[in-house]
Design a protein with these regions (language model features):
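Long terminal segments
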Residues: 2-7, 23-60, 137-201
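N-terminal targeting and processing segments
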Residues: 25-99, 103-108
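Bacterial N-terminal signal peptides
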Residues: 10-19
Length: 201
């Protein structure tokens, strides 16, 4: 994973943790059962089916970027084989970073709205991410470290919200947190086994 990706991931983690410290008395903890388990596995597995041909075997890598609107910024980096980086953006001043270090993995982003920032990073093999973002002034980071990890983040219709998800082999293999779309002025931190929802001050 490149140094700029590490710096961006660190910055987003620091932002989320600083919000958590400021609002520590108002933390809402959601158990793993609320966003993992059989339902997440069924939904995420069905979403993975269309991209399976791009991430099978020893094929080359695939990068696809589509942008409509004004002032968008995209960075995509793949180290490995048979991986796919797919980004679709529309709106104004949206920024996206995708980085894959490993093989047979896929990162997908569908983003619209205004002034949203998304970081997706995967280190390992056979990983999958799908992120949807709309609204304005949202910061979203999804970092996977491990193998055979898959998940979906739905942060649509949100405003001034920070969502940071860390998925490892200590997490369940399938991650699909619910209740993080349509949020306003909150920070959500997802770590193995827990999800913290914190109001921004």
């Amino acid at each position: 994973m490149t140094s700029w990706t590490k710096r961006l991931a660190g910055a987003m983690a620091a932002l989320a943790l600083s919000v958590g410290i400021a609002a520590a008395t108002e933390i809402r903890i959601v158990n793993e059962a609320d966003y993992g388990g059989a339902r997440a596995e069924a939904v995420v597995s069905s979403l993975m089916q269309p991209i399976n041909p791009f991430v099978a075997g020893q094929a080359g890598n695939t990068t696809s970027i589509a942008q409509i609107g004004t002032g968008h910024s995209v960075n995509s980096s793949i180290e490995g084989h048979s991986s796919a980086s797919l980004i679709a953006q529309e709106g104004t001043r949206n920024r996206a970073v995708q980085a894959i270090e490993g093989s047979n993995s896929a990162l997908l982003l569908v983003q619209s709205g205004t002034s949203n920032n998304v970081l997706q990073a995967s280190r390992g093999d056979n990983n999958f991410q799908l992120v949807g973002v709309s609204g304005s002034n949202n910061d979203v980071g999804y970092v996977q470290v491990g193998n055979n990890l898959a998940g979906v983040l739905d942060v649509r219709n949100s405003h001034n919200t920070t969502v940071v998800a860390f998925q490892t082999n200590q997490s369940r293999n399938f991650l699909m947190p619910t209740g993080i779309s349509g949020l306003n002025n909150v920070a959500v931190v997802i770590v193995p086994g827990k999800m913290y929802v914190l109001p921004k001050r």
